[in-house]
A protein has these predicted regions:
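Polytopic membrane enzymes that build or remodel cell-surface glycoconjugates and lipids
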Residues: 2-495, 499, 529, 533
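Conserved alpha-helical positions within TPR/SEL1-like repeat arrays
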Residues: 461-471, 495-506, 529-540, 563-570, ...
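Terminal, low-structured helical/coil segments at or just beyond the last alpha-helical repeat
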Residues: 582, 586-587, 594-626
Length: 626
């Protein structure tokens, strides 16, 4: 062998020696496996602890008079899990079909009674669980989306953990977690995330894939029974099929045989979503919650939709001045500055997404998923007084949080890890602090509405809510002033007239109270409460026949209205119709077994009836004696 060939051999042999790190810097395979296994469990624990810490003040919060009073404080139907409670839960009530959510609230009642701490604890634990499940979802997605993820055990775990925390402790999550009424958000979110995780598992292999697939269908059913907003999930799964699963589009195409199989496997999800959507529309119609075209025109709905897309993006980046209610403007000016800025932001994001669709394929996936998830609440089917709501971002924020984790992982080798970790700590500390402060806004009704008015003094519902607080505090003059302010902002605010009437009735001013009830019914013809109270005041004036007409109308509008049955019974008793009165008292108690007034009235009516029978018997006996 020549010297040249020997030298060549030496050069070939020497290359691996210079490319490998020193032995003490090379992690052994066993050590690497132990590190990755340790991180797989440590990171979720850290996520859970940080999320709990950020939302800890919620355990001191009370029920608030933003739907909590109607759903819990004044609603005996959910209090338990007996057959009568379950029958009520599994039928459409109060504008939503959420039987599984009601069952968790019924369990809360059995465990805690009416102590709000238990309700808040359950919501918090569900949210913490969602954060942990989302960590596993993101880790799986990053493993598929980015090259050579197996070499980044620590980086992968940290990036997925940061993504989970960006979702979990963002201030936009506070409304869903700290407001008991929104239990449906955190519960449906749990089954939504579990469905995605199980679906990803089903896509991994053929042997047990079908079992995982049908398990995903089953968990989707549970999500739909918790809140209908999850109907977007079939489309989100298709987006995941495109990226990062790469089961659709690209080399596979859109209409090839493998692609058609992808579409076919979505049929059960689509059918379930369609059924849930139909039930949701019927539920909204039953309480007249949907806005008519006369109330909000089609161009106005398009303006609201564009505004919502821009508004939520802005609040994700700058989560300050968050309010429990962003009220729909009385007049919709499409060229007003807030709307113009929203259009510009949406167009700019769309342009960026199109420009970066090849180098950053996760960006269009996140953008399309964001739009799809928000679509039901973007104003096309407007429901409620709000133009936007923080709670609507609970699922819509998942894609952007995943993208944040992907961005961190993709820059891990280009930036020093301690710099990236430091930036993540600063970001998460800021989000956690803002969330802590926002949770305290939801402590009680007074803080809630005072905060809302500080953000926007022209929010009629906030004036109304604060008026109810003052009425409960025994401050009728201040309550009336807030109702007056609410009506100045929104002259057709029937609920403000109703509550004004309640205060006047308590002040012993029946004529003035009746006038406000009349206006309330004129503005809200479906107000059973206004008819009931109007009838009660007429009964006090001795106009029993007129009073009974209002009780009948109240029960036509609200058949399970125990108080109306009690009042009708009382009017009948005054007319001397004790047998009919007793039947109405009993009906009231079947609807509300704890109704103390109906119990007392029933006992008195039975005693009077029995006394009458005794008097009659004594009278007949006397006649026979004579």
């Amino acid at each position: 062998m020549s010297r040249k060939s020997k030298a060549s051999n030496r050069e070939v042999a020497s290359r691996p020696q210079h490319s490998q790190p020193p032995p003490h810097e090379r992690p052994e395979p066993v050590a690497r496996a132990l590190l990755q296994g340790w991180l797989s469990w440590l990171v979720p624990v850290v996520i859970a602890l940080i999320t709990c810490a950020a939302f800890l003040p919620t355990l001191q919060n009370q029920f608030v008079n933003l739907d909590d009073n109607d759903n819990f404080l004044d609603n005996p139907h959910y209090r338990g899990l007996a057959w009568t409670h379950l029958r009520w839960m599994w039928t459409t009530h109060q504008g939503h079909y959420i039987p599984l959510t009601w069952m968790t609230l019924g369990l809360d009642y059995l465990l805690w009674g009416m102590n709000p701490v238990g309700y808040h604890l359950t919501s918090l634990l569900l949210h913490v669980t969602n954060a942990v499940v989302f960590f596993f979802v993101v880790r799986w997605l990053l493993t598929r989306a980015l090259p050579s993820p197996s070499e980044r055990g620590y980086a992968l775990a940290v990036s997925a953990g940061v993504a989970a925390l960006v979702f979990a402790i963002h201030p936009l999550r506070v409304e869903s977690v700290a407001w008991v009424t929104e239990r449906r958000d955190v519960l449906s979110g749990l089954f939504y995330l579990v469905t995605i995780l199980v679906y990803l598992r089903a896509c991994e292999g053929e042997e047990r894939g079908r079992r995982w697939y049908w398990l995903a269908v089953a968990t989707f059913v549970l999500a739909l029974l918790s809140k209908s907003m999850v109907v977007n999930l079939p489309v989100v799964l298709l987006i995941l099929d495109v990226y990062p699963l790469r089961r659709l589009g690209g080399a596979i195409g859109w209409w090839s045989e493998p692609a058609r199989r992808i579409y076919i496997e979505k049929i059960p999800f689509v059918l379930l979503a369609a059924g849930a959507s139909a039930i949701a529309v019927m539920a909204q119609s039953s309480v007249h919650a949907a806005a008519s075209l006369a109330q909000l025109s089609l161009p106005g709905r398009l303006v609201v939709s564009a505004y919502g897309l821009g508004f939520y993006l802005w609040k994700m980046v700058v989560p300050v001045n968050l309010s429990p209610l962003y009220e729909l403007p009385r007049t919709m000016d499409p060229v007003a500055p807030p709307f113009i800025l929203s259009y510009a932001l949406v167009l700019a994001i769309t342009a960026i997404v199109l420009a970066l669709r090849r180098p950053v394929p996760g960006l269009p996936a996140a953008w399309v998923a964001y739009v799809v998830v928000l679509l039901p609440v973007l104003g096309i089917l407007q429901s409620g007084p709000q133009i936007a709501a923080d709670r609507y971002t609970y699922l819509a924020g998942l894609g952007w949080a995943s993208l944040a984790g992907a961005g961190l992982l993709s820059t891990w080798r280009r930036w020093p890890p301690f710099v990236l970790t430091g930036l993540a700590v600063v970001l998460l500390s800021g989000l956690g602090t803002l969330s802590w402060n926002q949770v305290e806004v939801w402590h009680d009704s007074e803080k809630l509405w005072t905060h809302a008015l500080a953000i926007d003094p022209k929010t009629s519902m906030a004036q109304f809510g604060l008026g109810r607080v003052r009425a409960d505090q025994g401050k009728p003059a201040e309550a009336i002033e807030h109702y007056r302010q609410a009506l100045n902002i929104k002259p057709d605010y029937g609920a403000a007239h109703y509550n004004w009437g309640v205060v006047l009735g308590q002040q012993g001013k029946p004529a003035e109270a009746i006038e406000h009830y009349r206006l309330a019914v004129q503005m809200r013809p479906n107000s059973a409460d206004a008819h009931n109270n109007w009838g009660a005041l007429l009964g006090q004036q001795g106009r029993l026949a007129d009073a009974i007409e209002h009780f009948q109308q109240a029960l036509r509008l609200k058949p399970d209205f125990a108080e109306a049955h009690n009042n009708w019974g009382f009017a009948l008793a005054q007319q001397g119709k004790r047998a009919e009165a007793i039947e109405h008292y009993r009906h009231a108690l079947r609807l509300d077994p704890d109704n103390a007034l109906a119990q007392s009235n029933l006992l008195n009516a039975i005693q009077r009836r029995d006394m009458g029978k005794e008097d009659s018997a004594q009278s007949r006996k006397g006649e026979k004696t004579e």
